[in-house]
């Protein structure tokens, strides 16, 4: 099973722009990517543009839109796609995901997205963004494919906004992205009823 990790090097994690500079977001996104690659043996980074930092990583540059890039690979062979910001996944989670039966296997995100996707069908195609989980379910059903939903708390957390950073700081000790956030001053304040993300 070929595993791809889609990655966008330019202006990543724009929803964090109020609390992180562009340089910080670029470095953070790269650390997230490395966390994911730590869990996906032999994975290929599917980059939307060229980036010098990918030089020593197995990667392919595909400047087409995400759906075209992903679907073109699904048409060729059994493929899995793991988003590059799933900092909390582990090798065990990825193995369990890859071992799940089905023509199509989807790990949904907390906010309606598709965080991991596996296709053993040449017919399947993707429609990422804007509630992609339900769209992918409908596509699989329309094509008459056997669909499995992969239920994982850690796989459901993709790091996009401040609330996601809080989850990473609560659950991600030992991860590269966690250590980077700590190095630039982020921490969790437990002084109130609910934990809050703070920056020194």
Swiss-Prot record:
UniProt-listed Gene3D superfamilies: 6.10.140.50, Spore Coat Polysaccharide Biosynthesis Protein SpsA, Chain A
Keywords from the named record: GTP-binding, Nucleotide-binding, Nucleotidyltransferase, Transferase
EC number: 2.7.7.68
EC primary class: transferase
Gene Ontology biological process terms, A to Z: F420-0 metabolic process
Top-level taxon of origin: Archaea
Molecular-function GO term, any one: GTP binding
Coiled-coil regions listed in the entry: none
Family statement: Belongs to the CofC family.
Assembly notes: Homodimer.
Chain's role: Guanylyltransferase that catalyzes the activation of (2S)-2-phospholactate (2-PL) as (2S)-lactyl-2-diphospho-5'-guanosine, via the condensation of 2-PL with GTP. It is involved in the biosynthesis of coenzyme F420, a hydride carrier cofactor.
Name of protein: 2-phospho-L-lactate guanylyltransferase
Gene behind the chain: cofC
């Amino acid at each position: 099973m070929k595993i791809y990790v889609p990655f966008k090097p330019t202006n990543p994690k724009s929803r964090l722009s109020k609390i992180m500079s562009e340089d910080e977001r670029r470095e953070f996104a790269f650390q997230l990517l490395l966390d994911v690659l730590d869990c996906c043996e032999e994975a290929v980074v599917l980059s939307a543009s060229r980036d010098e930092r990918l030089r020593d990583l197995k990667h392919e540059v595909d400047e087409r839109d995400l759906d075209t890039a992903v679907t073109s690979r699904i048409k060729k062979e059994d493929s899995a796609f793991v988003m590059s910001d799933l900092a909390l996944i582990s090798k065990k989670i990825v193995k369990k995901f890859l071992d799940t039966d089905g023509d199509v296997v989807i790990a949904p995100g907390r906010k309606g997205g598709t965080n991991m996707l596996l296709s053993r069908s040449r017919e399947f195609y993707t429609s990422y963004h804007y509630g992609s989980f339900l769209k992918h379910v409908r596509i699989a059903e329309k094509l008459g494919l056997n669909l499995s939903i992969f239920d994982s708390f850690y796989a459901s957390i993709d790091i996009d906004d401040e609330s996601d950073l809080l989850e990473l700081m609560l659950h991600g000790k030992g991860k590269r992205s966690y250590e980077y956030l700590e190095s630039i001053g982020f921490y969790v304040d437990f002084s109130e009823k609910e934990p809050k993300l703070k920056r020194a």
